């Protein structure tokens, strides 16, 4: 049985942000929707687009908050509280500056590392950091003053090709996570490099 009951993809809403690095979490959710044949539908009480599906006998909920990134914790906590999903049963997919393009890693717990979506998620979950994260590497611009503009821009073609391969591997690993557990998925994904 899957330890994960809720999979969240972070991003900013609207066409303006759809292809920006900060939306890497939503990119992966869209791939999972194709892989597992589900559609996300807007659900205002959860401030997001949601789906529910059964995979290998496990009921899994998916969420893409439709709030801006810095308010995404509200959507996560609303859905988790409503369905009585514990923080350690949540996987949050997000862009990660500290990993290069072509790398994605799963980990449990930790701080927010300056990521506003994670910062709000931790706060909205009552300062509980025990949720899992699937970190999609986007690289770092090299100067902290450039980070905001960097995450709100599209990756270069070279970076996108690497990110694309990491997203493919992450899609396979989420399938493993649901069917065979988080440890097996973590071991495989954390060893991958495009």
From Swiss-Prot:
A GO term for molecular function: tRNA binding
Residues annotated as binding tRNA: 17, 68, 70, 116
SUPFAM superfamilies: Peptidyl-tRNA hydrolase-like
Reaction equations catalysed: an N-acyl-L-alpha-aminoacyl-tRNA + H2O = an N-acyl-L-amino acid + a tRNA + H(+)
GO CC field: cytoplasm
Enzyme class of the recorded protein, top EC level: hydrolase
EC number(s) on file: 3.1.1.29
UniProt keyword annotations, A-Z: Cytoplasm, Hydrolase, RNA-binding, tRNA-binding
Cross-referenced Pfam families: Pept_tRNA_hydro
UniProt subcellular location: Cytoplasm
Annotated site location: Stabilizes the basic form of H active site to accept a proton: 95
Single GO BP term: protein quality control for misfolded or incompletely synthesized proteins
Record protein name field: Peptidyl-tRNA hydrolase
KW Chaperone (keyword) present: no
Site residues, Discriminates between blocked and unblocked aminoacyl-tRNA: 12
Main location: cytoplasm
Active site: 22 (proton acceptor)
Function: Hydrolyzes ribosome-free peptidyl-tRNAs (with 1 or more amino acids incorporated), which drop off the ribosome during protein synthesis, or as a result of ribosome stalling.
Family named by the database record: Belongs to the PTH family.
Assembly description: Monomer.
């Amino acid at each position: 049985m899957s330890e994960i009951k809720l999979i969240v993809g972070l991003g900013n809403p609207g066409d303006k942000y759809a292809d920006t690095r900060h939306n890497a979490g939503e990119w992966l959710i869209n791939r999972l929707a194709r892989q597992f044949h589900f559609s996300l539908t807007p659900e205002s009480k959860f401030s997001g687009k949601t789906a529910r599906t059964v995979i290998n006998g496990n009921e899994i909920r998916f969420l893409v908050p439709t709030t801006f990134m810095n308010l995404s914790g509200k959507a996560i906590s609303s859905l988790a509280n409503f369905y009585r999903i514990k923080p350690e049963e949540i996987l949050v997919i997000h862009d990660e500056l500290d990993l290069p393009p072509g790398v994605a890693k799963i980990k449990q717990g930790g701080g927010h590392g300056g990521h506003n979506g994670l910062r709000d998620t931790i706060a909205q979950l009552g300062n509980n950091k025990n949720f899992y994260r699937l970190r999609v590497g986007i690289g770092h611009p090299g100067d902290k003053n450039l980070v905001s503009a960097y995450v709100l821009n599209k990756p270069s073609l070279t970076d996108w090709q690497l990110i694309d391969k990491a997203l493919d591997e992450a899609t396979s690993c989420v399938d493993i996570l649901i069917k065979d557990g988080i440890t097996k998925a973590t071991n495989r994904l954390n060893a991958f490099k495009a």
